[in-house]
Amino acid sequence: MAEGSQSAPEAGNDMGNDDAIGGNVSKYIVLPTGYCGQPKKGHLIFDACFESGNLGRVDQVSEFEYDLFIRPDTCNPRFRVWFNFTVENVKESQRVIFNIVNFSKTKSLYRDGMAPMVKSTSRPKWQRLPPKNVYYYRCPDHRKNYVMSFAFCFDREEDIYQFAYCYPYTYTRFQHYLDSLQKRNMDYFFREQLGQSVQQRKLDLLTITSPDNLREGAEQKVVFITGRVHPGETPSSFVCQGIIDFLVSQHPIACVLREYLVFKIAPMLNPDGVYLGNYRCSLMGFDLNRHWLDPSPWVHPTLHGVKQLIVQMYNDPKTSLEFYIDIHAHSTMMNGFMYGNIFEDEERFQRQAIFPKLLCQNAEDFSYSSTSFNRDAVKAGTGRRFLGGLLDHTSYCYTLEVSFYSYIISGTTAAVPYTEEAYMKLGRNVARTFLDYYRLNPVVEKVAIPMPRLRNKEIEVQRRKEKSPPYKHPLLRGPASNYPNSKGDKKSSVNHKDPSTPF
């Protein structure tokens, strides 16, 4: 959750000394008590020593049940939400229950039907587990902390299975994406390195606009967008990519926006935290979104660099910083929505509500009713609050939140789980909304994004998919009663609002 605050007594589940966790597990083999010799098929091997991985400890409870401990953020034991690990050396038809036992938050979308993500080497596309096999409850065996348990059936012995809290989006993937954009040699796309993280990873800054807007002495209307200040909030990167993809496209709306506006985008403010698999903090254990007031060039170098640039633009008489949008993901609420500021100037406050209202009209997954405006003292160090107080009355600062789980279409009660594409679609709709805000509609007709033309072979494949039902993982073919009971699941019930998605 982007702007949520957890004081020490309310930090969530307790983690006692017996739960002390160091780094990630590395090819950790779980052997039965008293067993000697080489591991056999079915003796699971856990690993999280890879980019954005997180799993700190594994305890075998029984032949089929395992307690899994999230590794806390580096240098900060308070935050334990993100997990991302692999399991191999499985046996065909082996059924297991995994219990994530040390979440630092008590409130969770797991209560509403959210489920972990899974993929395997032979099925590399991420999918959500069936909600009917996921349980979220207070567990007496873990000091009545909240535990998330899920049942799973391994079906292919040669596969390596990967489980994650949400769709991963790594630093390396991000760099490859920017490299691919740079190779296109677009005269309206500019990439520069604004600075480096503590571990010397790049702080990329993108500028997307018509070259005419960058000529010396040209006046600029700037929209500044940041993302991934909290590394575990991976939907932020997908939304940001959707914004970028749309702005660099040849869509008529994108062409008009580039002529009228200058988009400055810093898509990954916390590259070290992303790489390390942290949920909220940087390498040194700082929540960067609480240090906008006085960021250190040594401790918070990426934040320091972005703040310096924004202040420099603010002081430039030729530059009008119109918008600042910081993109996050939310762990307890549905839909996309925004946080804004409260101002003494009533007219400015009312004008601030225009953009989210327009976005609500353009994006079915964005909720204006969930959008709120505040000046809570504990949020003073956030980008939204700090810049809202620094910039003048013509500037508007928002936190854009998007659910880790799903959105509810207006007029219905059904929860639609987010996909990578759905997150990126929200990003495209954010970009399109600037056309409405600046009333540029007469310049270009509002048209839907054209569908890509398919070759004959692709058309035939698509037709077959439409005629035949999708492949179902064996996990979905049997009733939930086939799975062994998890500790405490008899007392727990989950109100699942969405249909299960096949793996």
Curated annotation (Swiss-Prot):
Any one cellular-component term (Gene Ontology): ciliary basal body
Enzyme active site: E401 (proton donor/acceptor)
Main location: cytoplasm
Gene3D superfamilies, A to Z: 2.60.40.3120, Zn peptidases (3.40.630.10)
Tagged with keyword Iron-sulfur: no
Domain of life: Eukaryota
Cofactor: Zn(2+)
PANTHER family linked: CYTOSOLIC CARBOXYPEPTIDASE (PTHR12756), CYTOSOLIC CARBOXYPEPTIDASE 6 (PTHR12756:SF9)
Reported function: Metallocarboxypeptidase that mediates protein deglutamylation of tubulin and non-tubulin target proteins. Catalyzes the removal of polyglutamate side chains present on the gamma-carboxyl group of glutamate residues within the C-terminal tail of tubulin protein. Specifically cleaves tubulin long-side-chains, while it is not able to remove the branching point glutamate. Also catalyzes the removal of polyglutamate residues from the carboxy-terminus of non-tubulin proteins such as MYLK.
Protein name listed in UniProt: Cytosolic carboxypeptidase 6
Species of the source: Homo sapiens
Lineage summary: Eukaryota, Metazoa, Chordata, Craniata, Vertebrata
